[in-house]
Amino acid sequence: LLNAYPFQPYSVPVMLKLLLQLDSSRLPSVFDQVVAYDAGADRVISEGGVTEGDVRDLVYGCIFTRGPKDMKNTAIFIGGADMSIGEKLLTAASKAFFANFRVSTMLDSNGSNTTAVAAVVKITKALGGNVKGRKIVVTAGTGPVGTRAAGLLARAGADVTITSRKPEDGTRVSEAICKRFGGTVHAVPLRESSQAAAAIEGGEVLLNAGPAGVMLVPRAAWAGKFKVVVDLNAVPPLGIEGVEVNDDGAQREGAIAFGALGIGNFKMQVHKECLSRLFTRNDLVLDAETIEDVAKELMK
């Protein structure tokens, strides 16, 4: 009879690495899901159209299901098309945590944090490791990537100028950047490429964070005048005329140049490394500044 029911030793279930994807857009980003799996997540639990009011109960599902030593195997990734909503979701998640009932969390709505960080770290390295006192112009600097990049550069001591189509938007955003990151950020109008030369005059570093397929800075406006130029636009016509999409430290018109893919490849390294680190502890919060710390380690 015993031989008919052979003893089956108890096997401890594998503790899966679970990533809760809180996406403010109706359809959760497939891009973010794929990167999460490539970074080592075993399962991605995706929620779309997430609002502030949804966050607490979703977070409770993360923090009340595993014991203290296993809590690090659950993490949260906040994404979506709108960074301003993402920031609110991060705040709501942080408020739901208490004592050691928390899980590591990363904010990267629309890839804004990792893209901005990748650009800033590349710029810093190209300048010898220090941007303090450098005059840096961020064209289309009122968008999510531009504001994060400008903020990180200002925080590091750079003299930053952002451009905006509307002067009132530039003023409002520059004040918000200074409030969040500190430092000095000016704003100048730039409505069309014919105004670029005046808008970027006196700069040492040029970073374009403008919309896809819009050329903001003609070659004549920057050639021979800048030490570093970075264009985050990958769709022709590119944002800075004369910079190639694959540039990754190439020499262009006397400047060290980085194109969208030159920055994008490093952005992907940073993104994956950050996701991987979420599962090493249960109290990590990865926003612009802390993501930059990770990127600097990778750049060494």
What are these regions (language model features)?
Residues 1-100, 290-300:
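N-terminal ligand-binding/catalytic initiation module
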Residues 26, 81-85, 111-115, 141-146, ...:
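Gly/Ser/Thr-rich loops at beta-strand to alpha-helix junctions
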Residues 50-54, 84-88, 114, 118, ...:
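Conserved active-site and cofactor/substrate-binding residues in soluble primary-metabolism enzymes
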Residues 98-106, 132, 252-254:
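Glycine/charged-rich beta-loop-alpha catalytic/anionic-binding loops adjacent to active sites
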Residues 106-124:
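A glycine-rich, Thr/Ser-enriched phosphate-binding loop motif common to dinucleotide/cofactor-binding enzymes
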Residues 125-205:
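Glycine-rich phosphate/diphosphate-binding loop of Rossmann-like nucleotide-binding domains
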Residues 185-257:
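Rossmann-like adenosine-cofactor binding region
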Residues 235-300:
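Adenosine-phosphate binding glycine-rich loop
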